[in-house]
Structure formats: structure tokens, C-alpha cells
Amino acid sequence: NLIQFSNMIQCANKGSRPSLDYADYGCYCGWGGSGTPVDELDRCCKVHDDCYAEAGKKGCYPKLTLYSWDCTGNVPICNPKTECKDFTCACDAEAAKCFAKAPYKKENWNIDTKTRCK
């Protein structure tokens, strides 16, 4: 679920940036998304959105699905239980690792999505 995703982000980035910093970044980080991602971090968010869409096609509710995971050496590790839990956990873990590797550009936070995300 989204709270677990937030915790995974903290695991992967070693607590270096609050999870909320990603909530209004670029064209895809946060609710919804459209247009072309503005940078590598925004691409991570688009991939995560697409992964959640795939989970939805499988009948899963990724924003609400609780799953089991551990933080081992700043790497989120999923403990598979059911298809929906495993799929959702994998979406979140891959996104958290992607966020940790991608540069955060302050100029892409809280952008005007109407003009920049076409």
C-alpha cells in the first residue's frame, strides 16, 4: 500500500529524502500523470504508475494491498504470499530502488503540469 511504499522509499534512499518530496514531482510522481516524463526520476514514477495499472488489470488494488517485505542493506526485499501482494510489492520495490538512483532536481518539483506535461 502507499504507506509501505513510502517506507520502502526511505529504505532505498537511506532516509536521505522524505517520501513526500516525491509526491508532487514532474509529470508522474503523485496522483495521475500525463505527457513525457521530465527526467529520470519522473520516468521512475511513470514506470511505477504503469506497474500499478498492470496490477489493476490482474484484479489487484495496489494502493490498498498490504504485503510483507524487509529492508536489507538499504534494499527492499519482498516476501511473496499471493499474486497481488507479490506484484504490488515488486512494483513498489523497483520504484524505490529507481528513486534512490535517480537525481532529484528541485526545479522539477511542483511544476506547472498544464504546460510541461503535454
Swiss-Prot record:
It is an enzyme of class 3 (hydrolase). Keywords: Calcium, Disulfide bond, Hydrolase, Lipid degradation, Lipid metabolism, Metal-binding, Secreted. Ca(2+) binds at Y28, G30, G32, D49. Disulfide bonds join C11-C71, C27-C117, C29-C45, C44-C98, C51-C91, C60-C84, C78-C89. This is Basic phospholipase A2 PA-5. Expressed by the venom gland. It is found in: Secreted. Its cofactor is Ca(2+). Gene3D superfamilies: Phospholipase A2 domain. It catalyses: a 1,2-diacyl-sn-glycero-3-phosphocholine + H2O = a 1-acyl-sn-glycero-3-phosphocholine + a fatty acid + H(+). It comes from Pseudechis australis (Mulga snake). InterPro entries: PLipase_A2, PLipase_A2_dom, PLipase_A2_dom_sf, PLipase_A2_His_AS. Binds 1 Ca(2+) ion. GO terms for molecular function: calcium ion binding; calcium-dependent phospholipase A2 activity; phospholipid binding. Coiled coil: none annotated.
